[in-house]
Amino acid sequence: MRKPLLLFLPKRMMVLALPLMLSLCSYAATVTSQLSVNMKTDKACYVPGQTVTFVAEGNIPSSAKVRYRYGSHVLLVQDFSEVAKSKQWTWLPPSADYQGYLVELYTEGSGVENILGTIAVDVSSNWKRFPRYGFVADFDNYSSTVDKNANIKSEMAYLNRLHINGVQFQDWQWMHHRPVKLNGDGSLTQWYTDISNRWVGVEYVKNYIATQHAYGMKSIFYNLCFGAWKDAANDGVKSQWALMKKDGNGNYYQDYHGLPSSWASNIYLQVPGNGDWQQYMVERNKEVYGNFDFDGFQIDQLGYRGTVYDANHQKVDLPSGYGSFIDAMKQAHPEKSLIMNAVSGYGTEQIVNKNVDFCYNEVWGNGNGYGGAPEDQFANLYDIIATNDRLSDHLHPTVFAAYINYDKADNGGSGDHMLTREYFPAAPLAMSDELKTALVRYYDFLTAYQNWLRGVSSKAAYSAHVSVNGNTVKAWPPQANSIVTFAKTVGNSDVVHFLNFSNTSDLSWRDLNGTRQKPTRKDNLAVTIQTNRKVSKLWVASPDTHAGAVQELSFEQMGNQLTFTLPSLEYWTMVVMEGESQVYLTGEAVKKDGYGAYDLSQAIPLNKASGGNVYKTTVYLKGNELFKFTDGRDWGYCKSYCSEYENYQFNSHIQLAHLSTFGNDYKFCVPESGYYDITINLDSMRIVVKKADPMAIEGVTADVAANKDHAPWYSLAGDRAPNPHKGIYVKKGRKVVFK
């Protein structure tokens, strides 16, 4: 009974002092915004190779440009007037799978970029990589008093604008044990009532599905894994399948979920792991898929039920039954998606397996009656994500069904409704226009930066060391009256999220009565971050500012201290520090004397060959001294690429070593001093080290000014030359002739 609230949170940091270095980024344009243009796409998501069609609505200056970004990287800039006809145009994204992009409409002048509007694009061949889950729960035209098909069109257009790529159909079915109502001749009954006696029109269920498919969304039907109505025996449900409980007098009775007396029935529970019950539901699902074009099954449960028994009065392990039920449903329809609700985490270990598309948790507060740990704090959400991530072997993202304004829902409302209760069809709260706009901004942000937000597992998290002048800063988990940071490593970048808890002591994600005050916006914050990598670019983005557009920032890096000015922090601002992408050769073997090349000023960078992930250098190595390869993107961590063997020795007979990036800090050596050609191929995962011909080393003519670089010089004989003047010397594998 659910809808998505997504957070991804992690933990680790080692800081080693880098050599003294000062780095300033290039000048970046000032970014402002006048968000007067609404942008739309024709689909919620795209498979690689599909063309995106855009529509822009609003007053667009003739000088406007369209920019397509992957993170901060600009893929393409076009003049809007040249590409758009009637404010409509197309774009073919790169062919890479599972990528998010941000498309910006803007003007520029005098060093200022003015953002007019933005929209995200998701290119993913399977929705389960980056799920954005919505729901529908009303399938009635109320005796023709509403134009339901028009409502479907507008509702799905809004979900499309949010890039929702999967939609759950709540309480669409007839009976839980007979979801499809058929006439005597096997045809569909066009109208029926659900368990709460609401009318359901088959026409509208099918129209929702067709409209969603046109937008590239998945349509997922909801049902319990073990529910049946009263008198289900008339439909073939056997008493031997019943899930039993025992009262205080030792009497057994069938477990049930009680519902209001005005409803059609209570829900009577079956043993989910019973093979005959599973086969019964497989047959019912054949009727579902045979009559409706659903893409999968949202499986529900009811959380912890206490001690339960089967019809033979043997104890039943419900979580094991859930896992068995999932496997049976997948075996029967392997092409269909499966998602199962882990209510308050109950049964997570058995539910989170290879047969579900992603993890789905209905979360509550303390004392919710479903068992499990407290889950009403932001920190609890991270714990759930980390648990799901670990149990799924880092394969599955997490979707939350989180009822934020649960008690405020008693006050009523109308219009497009929020998910406030576990009974999805209830519509007590309407979304304000302000909230609708904010959701567009946040879903654009979630989609455009999905590779930075959800592109790596919780293993990538670390605790960042951050200070903000004049403010209290705490690393995750949240603490009262503080700016809270959460950090993770993504590729060659460190990503630090700034979360504004500075004017609240309430650290719960639940705002039961909708009374929590907004955070106080902070501007132009002086920030210092300790970083263990050499930063090449710094940029920020926020769903609260400039519709999520990238702002590149100037910064200074002195040693391991990175300083910059954060433009603003309202709720959430993401800071991305792009690290230098380089493979280095380090160790005692690359220095004739001293302590070995273990900092960036002394290490030898390998040159990246054109195309692929191949790095090469020719360098003088001292025999029987250790060297290793390290990734400049994570210099401070200082773990090398490693081979199958510790202290592996390259010689004339063995020149290859398998390459990985995990495990111990392996080092290598060569048997004799001399020049060596070194190649690291990160595609084939191989290291090649072989003797080089010194006279074949590339020659470069230079003047003495070339000596200002800090890398060491050597004579052709391999001796260290601290101050070369005239003659031929070797540096970084290149022969240099000084005149």
Segments the model singles out, each with a brief description of its role:
Residues 693-717:
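Residue-level detector of functionally pivotal "anchor" positions at catalytic/ligand-binding pockets or at interdomain
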Residues 273-356, 368, 375-379:
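Active-site neighborhood of glycoside hydrolase catalytic domains
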Residues 126-131, 137-148, 221, 225-292:
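Active-site-adjacent "subsite" loops/lids of carbohydrate-active enzymes
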Residues 558-580, 676-686:
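C-terminal beta-strand-rich structural cap/linker in extracellular carbohydrate-active enzymes
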Residues 580-623, 632-659:
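Aromatic-rich carbohydrate-binding modules that target alpha-glucans
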Residues 116-175:
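An acidic-aromatic substrate-binding cleft motif
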Residues 155-203, 227-246, 258-277, 304-312:
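Aromatic-lined carbohydrate-binding/catalytic grooves of carbohydrate-active enzymes
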Residues 472-533, 570-573:
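Carbohydrate-binding surface patches
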